[in-house]
Amino acid sequence: MRRNTFLLLSSIFLLSLPSICIAQQNQKLEYGILIDTTGSMRSQFGIVSVLAKAIVHQVHDHGPVSIFSFDSEGVGRGSRAVPTARIERTQDEDLLNRTIDGLYVQGGQTTLLDAIEFMDKRLRAQAGATDRIIILITDGEDRVSTEKQADLVRKLKDDNVSVYAIGLVRELEGGKRSKAIKLLTSLTKETGGRVVFPKGDRVEIQAVLSELSLPIQ
C-alpha cells in the first residue's frame, strides 16, 4: 500500500514538472526607470544620462521599459517637481536613448516617494508582467512628497514591485546625505531590491551595474 502511494505521488510530481517549467518560462519582467531631473542633480546630469542608457542597454531585451522624470509645476519657492512618464513600454533601444537625450534639469521641490507611487500605478496599468522593477537614478532627496514611505512599501510589495537605486549622494551636505542614504537603503531593502552608492569623483559604469545586479531573466 505504501509503495503504491509513493508511486502515485511520484507520478503526480513528474506530471506537474512541465507546468512548473512553463510557469517559470512565462515569468515576465517590466522595467521603469526614474531619471531625477530636479535641480540638485544639475552638476551630475551628464553621468545620470550615461547610467540611464547603460541600464536601457542591459535590460531592454528582457522586457518593456518605461522612462520617467520630473516636470516643474508652479513658480518660485512653492514650485514642485512632479513625476511624469516620458515613454512607456517599449523595447526599442534607440527610441529609449532619444528619450533620455531629450531630458533636461528643471526646478521644483523633489517628490521622490510620489514619483515611485506614480510609476507603480503606470506599470500596474498594463497587464502581462509578473514582476516589475523600478530603477531610480537619483540623489535620494525627497522634500515635499505626500506619499508616506510605509504606505508606499506596502503597495509595492502587494504589486510585486522591487526597487533598485543608484544613489548619487556625493554632493549632498552631511544631514541631507545621511537622510537620502537611509531612504534609498530602506526602500530597496524592504522591496527586495538593491542600492549602489558610487564612491569617488568618477563613476565606473560597469562596476555600478555589476553591483546593482538588475534582474534580467
For each of these PLM feature ranges, what is it?
Residues 21-23:
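Boundary at the C-terminal end of the N-terminal hydrophobic targeting segment
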Residues 26-86, 112-119, 132-138:
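Von Willebrand factor
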